[in-house]
Every structure is written in C-alpha cells, then in structure tokens.
C-alpha cells in the first residue's frame, strides 16, 4: 500500500492501524480555484491519489488533503511567522471548520469521502498568539496550527473527529481501507 502524502502526522496515524505501507509524495499542486471547502478537500485528495496511482497501478493508494475554513475564507498553510500570527488571530474566539478529504484507489476502483469537524478556539491575547507563532509549529499545517502539539492549548472545543483535525480522519480511513480489502489492525 502507498500513502500519497509526505505528512508525518498521516504517516504516524496510518502506522498505528497496523497497515504496512510506503510513502510516495504526489507533488500535486494544492492551489485550485474551487472555493467550497468540502469539495476542495475531496478533489485534492483524489488528484493526489490518481497522480501516485499512475506510477503504481497495482498498489492500493490512499491520499488525503485538509482544508480549514473560517466562514467563506480558506486558510491554507501560512507562508511565514507573520501570516501564522494573522491566521491564529482570525481564529481566536471563533469556530471554524476542518475538512479532510480521503481517497483510496485499488484495482481501478476509487472510493472516497470528506470528514468535517468544528473547532472553537478560546479567546487569545496577542502575546499568546505571538508565542505560538514563534514556535513554528503551525507553518506546515492548514489553518496555521497543530492540534496534536502545543496548538491544543488554543482550542476550547472540538465537535467531531479529533483525528480529522490532525489531518487523517481514522473512522473514514478505516471504512475506506476495509472497503478496498485492506486488513486493518491485523484482521
């Protein structure tokens, strides 16, 4: 099986399912005109899976992509500390949505889905935001924060799948893998 993602968080979560795999990064661009976050997450996951499957047609390929939305605004990965600060400032005291699309390709069959989780940040001071931005933790993450690290201190509430906010919704992943005939947890 191939994980079409360079994300260390996705790699760790998939490894915890006891599924042997290797990583092949798709190189697929994440910049698309689609503005609906659920459709965008699903479309990007599918494009990544298809890109890797072209070179590995006999493998089961799984890909994922995460999109963070605050109202109509999509928050990608911040370019630098200043943009990271601005993202967290916008999220402070508000509820946003995290969408992760997952696609599995196996034997010419394609299946996928999108998971949504609502995340509410607590009210934050400018000093707290600056401290978090300086950690650099959010620079490689959609929305500019990592819930599995220090970023958990920013969060007041989660409604939905925690692993979705990490970037790999395990309930959806397990369902899709089993549907493709992949044994999970030594089944």
Swiss-Prot record:
- Site Important for substrate specificity: which residues? 9, 66, 148
- Is Hydrolase one of the keywords? yes
Q: Which InterPro entries match?
A: ITPase-like_fam (IPR029001), Maf-like (IPR003697)
Return the similarity comment: Belongs to the Maf family. YhdE subfamily.
Root EC class: hydrolase
Organism domain of life: Bacteria
NCBIfam families named in the record: maf, PRK14361.1
Q: Could you tell me the EC number(s) of this protein?
A: 3.6.1.9
Q: What processes in GO biological process is this protein linked to? A: nucleotide metabolic process
Please provide the record's keywords in A-Z order. Answer: Cytoplasm, Hydrolase, Nucleotide metabolism
Active-site residues? 65
| Keyword Ribonucleoprotein annotated | no
Organism (species): Deinococcus geothermalis (strain DSM 11300 / CIP 105573 / AG-3a)
Give the protein name, as stated in the record. dTTP/UTP pyrophosphatase
Q: Which subcellular locations apply to this protein?
A: Cytoplasm
What's any one GO cellular component for it? cytoplasm
GO function terms (MF aspect): dTTP diphosphatase activity; UTP diphosphatase activity
Question: Which Cys residues form disulphide pairs?
Answer: none
Q: Name one Pfam family in it.
A: Maf
| Obligatory cofactor(s) | a divalent metal cation
Provide the primary localization. cytoplasm
- Tell me, in a sentence or two, what this protein's role is: Nucleoside triphosphate pyrophosphatase that hydrolyzes dTTP and UTP. May have a dual role in cell division arrest and in preventing the incorporation of modified nucleotides into cellular nucleic acids.
Reaction catalysis annotation: dTTP + H2O = dTMP + diphosphate + H(+); UTP + H2O = UMP + diphosphate + H(+)
